Structure formats: C-alpha cells, structure tokens
C-alpha cells in the first residue's frame, strides 16, 4: 500500500489561445510566444474559438474586448456559464473603466489597453499559465480523491463519515459504539478503507478527504 497521493504529471502542454480580429496582432503575438516555446492557437472571433476548444485543453486566453459579433465580455460570460476555467487576459483598443471593472469582476486576471508592450503581455501570460497549471493539478488531485472514495461501500463510507465528524471517537471501540457493530468488524472495515483509499493512516485519510471538502465541520 502506498501513502503517496500525488497525481502523475500530465504531458499535455498548456495552450495560449488568442482571440483577436486584428491579423497583425494575432501573427506577431503568436510568433513571439512560439519563439519562447509556447503552444499557441489563434482565432479571429469568439465562435471560431468555441468551436475549437474542448475541456481537455488548458492554458490561458488572450481576448480582445472589441470583437465583431460576440464581444470579449460576452465570451467571458459564456465561458463562466459553461464552466470553462481558462484564465483570461483582456486586450482592447477602446476599453474604459466600466469594461475593465466588468472584466475583472467576471474573473479576468488582467485588462491591458492597446498599444501594449509585448514583453509586458508575455509576463502576464507566463503568470496566467502558472496559475492554470496549479489549477489543473488541483483538479486532477480532486478527481483522483473522488475516484478513491467512490470505491467505498455504504458501510465503509458510514465509518469514514464518523471518523471525520468525530475524530476523538475514531478508535475501533468508539466507532463500534456509535454504529452498533463489533470492534472486530470495525477493524476489518478500517483495513479495507485504508487499502481502497491508498492511504496508510487516518491522518492521510483526512488529508485526502479535505481535497473534496469531505471533512464536515464539527459542532462546537
């Protein structure tokens, strides 16, 4: 049994998505990013981006606010409604304070006005990609934890719930009293629980549960 609960690293590289109707900006920015080793995909409008994007992709989005058709802010709202988690950096040639405030409230990590220094934008992109990698790792760890808990039987889950809600009564005798079963039966279930969850101790079990916010708040 292994106590190592880290997920394996994904080989999928992050993607910098660029959505801007200006072909010169798309071309120059794509070239600069590729020279720095980034994977880049660019689109002239929001519909083309949405047609290409799927949930297996991660990275960040460089988004022009003044797009024809669906605007940048409208695309941001659509992404939020659909649960698309890409960090967004807005770029605009005619944005004002209301637009920038709306974008930031919607979850954008930055709002730059054209003309911008390319080096400044690339710095923001690098920060956004680091945030995306951290988020992806967190989601992978949560998915892994959820899959482990789904292996438990209803009785095993009942025992785990008791252990999380009542850590001071997490001994075999304490659980046996609470659930009206024998300590020997509890010992058998505990061994199976640790095996299924791939943990070596109750402390590791609690750490795994916290990834899913599974640990209930005890009453004071």
Tell me what each language-model feature is.
Residues 56-63, 67:
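Active-site beta3 strand of CheY-like receiver
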Residues 191-220:
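Basic, Lys/Arg-enriched C-terminal extension of HTH/homeodomain DNA-binding domains
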């Amino acid at each position: 049994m292994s106590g190592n609960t880290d997920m394996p690293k994904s080989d999928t590289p992050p993607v910098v998505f660029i959505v801007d109707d200006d072909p010169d900006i798309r071309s120059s920015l794509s070239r600069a990013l590729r020279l720095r080793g980034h994977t880049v995909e660019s689109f002239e409008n929001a519909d083309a981006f949405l047609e290409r994007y799927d949930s297996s992709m991660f990275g960040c989005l460089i988004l022009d606010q003044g797009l024809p058709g669906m605007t940048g802010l409208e695309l941001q709202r659509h992404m939020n409604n659909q649960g698309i988690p890409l960090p967004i950096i807005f770029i605009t040639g005619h944005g004002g304070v209301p637009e920038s405030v709306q974008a930031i409230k919607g979850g954008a990590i930055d709002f730059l006005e054209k003309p911008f220094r390319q080096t400044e934008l690339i710095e923001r992109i690098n920060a956004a990609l680091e945030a995306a990698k951290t988020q992806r790792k967190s989601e992978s760890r949560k998915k892994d934890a959820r899959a482990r808990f789904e292996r438990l039987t209803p009785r095993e889950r009942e025992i785990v719930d008791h252990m999380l809600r009542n850590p001071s009564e997490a001994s075999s005798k304490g659980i046996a009293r609470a659930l009206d079963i024998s300590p020997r039966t509890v010992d058998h279930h505990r061994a199976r629980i640790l095996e299924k969850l791939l943990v070596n101790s109750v402390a590791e079990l609690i750490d795994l549960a916290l990834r899913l916010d599974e640990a209930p708040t005890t009453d004071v």
